[in-house]
Amino acid sequence: MSSAPVKVPRYYTVKTQIAELIDGAAPGTVLPTERELAVRFDTSRTTVRQALAELVVDGRLERTQGSGTFVAEPKIVQVRQLNSYTEDLRQQGRTPSSIVLSVTRERASDAVAANLALPPGAAVHRVERLRGVAGEPLAHEVAWLPGPLPRLRQELERRGSLYQTLREAYGIELSRAEDTVETALAGPADAQLLSVDVGLPMLLIHRTGYDPTGRPVEWTRSVFRGDRFRFVAVSSLDS
């Protein structure tokens, strides 16, 4: 028994047509107006508006109030490996930015304690940062670190990279990390920090980093803008 053909929504067809239109266009290229696109694709402005909105969420377009719709910069690709955000982007020739929002000592919650193999209530460092590229905010990150780490804020602000700071200032080397990646929607706090709309699709990543003895030395929660980031996982068969 053959199944009925799937009906493709009109806005999705228009979205595909606009995506083809901007393929190869330079970032910053201005798109025709909604009215012009509606005439070009023989559809309503409402349909065009929905198609454009999805392309904005996908990271293909950017909209500026009063200025129009533009082709967006390509998504930043981050290969998940044992590098810090700062080190990874420097290897790509980009200019990472990092603003330290706070560095505090607190009692570990049950979740933090479990991921760092500590008893609940143990003292940990909490490091909150806003990560970006060339000054554009792209990720909100909170890391929890065990152990005494004197002058952590000063050491971190001097180097920028958390892993470099742990290695050079405290002799802590990371040998492996475990990442969990899932989707999430931007809440009010992340939306305000990252200058995006509430409800924008985000990438939520939890990482646990281990030293060569297998001791957890980092648990990090990172929220990345889904319209600006694409993650790549590289796998290989064991010999």
Give the label of every model feature segment:
Residues 31, 56-66, 72:
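Beta-hairpin "wing" of winged helix-turn-helix
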Residues 7-15, 33, 67-83:
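Short, cationic-aromatic polyanion-contact patches
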Residues 96-239:
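C-terminal all-alpha effector/ligand-binding and dimerization domain
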Residues 1-45, 50-53, 91:
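Extreme N-terminal segment that seeds HTH/winged-HTH DNA-binding domains in transcriptional regulators
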Residues 39, 45-46, 50-58, 62-63, ...:
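Extended, compositionally biased flexible segments
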